[in-house]
């Protein structure tokens, strides 16, 4: 057995209806928020409408279409939107792929070059936009760590991203929106906060 240390400075808020606490975890009212999501599951389970209701005091910009094994081309579009709209905070709604993508988007928004550079060289990761995630499916554990997997169709690569150099930014992550691993089960919301 190998020796190791594990440090997860995690604040987990778990329980039925706890998603209503989301606004208390967000920046000041009027902040500019990117709502990042996948292919539509959050609309099918009415999570989108609930999030828009909870975010009604903020200027919200939707970014949908984050695919499984998120592509750097999708991340580039989201980074461009964050820069153009001066996004203050990101809410990731979906599964592990959405969270993985948002980790790269959050760091890419403060990076002057191509976000793929951050995947190739983790030491380039500096500041990042704080974010929270409301997880609809527990599967990958992306909501519990500072890493993810990003794909590049142009180079046929699937690479690991680690955001360990994110400084003192606050990351808010969420976990779980259903009682079961099946989307559409009884709703149970969780919101998790991780500070770095």
Label each residue range with its predicted role.
Residues 20, 111-196:
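A glycine/threonine-rich phosphate-anchoring loop and its flanking beta-alpha core
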Residues 78-79, 98-112, 144-145:
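Short Gly/Thr/Asp-enriched flexible loops that form oxyanion-binding sites at enzyme active sites
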Residues 44-45, 101-102, 142-143, 176:
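Alpha-helix N-cap/helix-start motif
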Residues 26, 30, 55, 82, ...:
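Structural signal for hydrophobic packing residues in well-ordered secondary-structure cores
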Residues 10, 16-17, 37-39, 66, ...:
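Fold-independent oxyanion-binding glycine-rich loops
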Residues 87-105, 136-142:
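Glycine/serine-rich anion-binding loops at beta->alpha junctions
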Residues 84, 105, 122:
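N-terminal loops that bind phosphate or other acidic moieties
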Residues 1-89:
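ATP/NTP phosphate-donor binding region
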């Amino acid at each position: 057995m190998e020796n190791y240390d594990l440090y997860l400075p995690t604040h987990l808020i778990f329980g039925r209806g706890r998603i209503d606490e989301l606004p208390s975890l967000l920046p000041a009212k009027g902040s500019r928020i990117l709502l990042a999501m996948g292919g539509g599951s959050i609309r099918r389970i009415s999570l989108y409408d609930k999030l828009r209701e909870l975010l009604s005091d903020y200027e919200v910009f939707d970014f949908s279409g984050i695919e499984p094994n998120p592509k750097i081309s999708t991340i580039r579009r989201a980074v461009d939107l964050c820069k153009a709209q001066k996004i203050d905070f990101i809410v990731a709604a979906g599964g592990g792929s959405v969270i993985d993508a948002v980790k790269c988007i959050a760091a890419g928004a403060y990076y002057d070059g191509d976000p793929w550079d951050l995947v190739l060289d983790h030491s380039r990761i500096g500041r990042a936009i704080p974010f929270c995630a409301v997880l609809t499916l527990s599967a990958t554990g992306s909501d519990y760590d500072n890493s993810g997997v990003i794909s590049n169709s142009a180079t046929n690569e699937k690479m690991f991203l680690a955001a360990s150099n994110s400084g003192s930014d606050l990351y808010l992550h969420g976990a779980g929106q259903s009682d079961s691993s099946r989307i559409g089960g009884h709703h149970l919301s969780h919101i998790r906060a991780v500070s770095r």
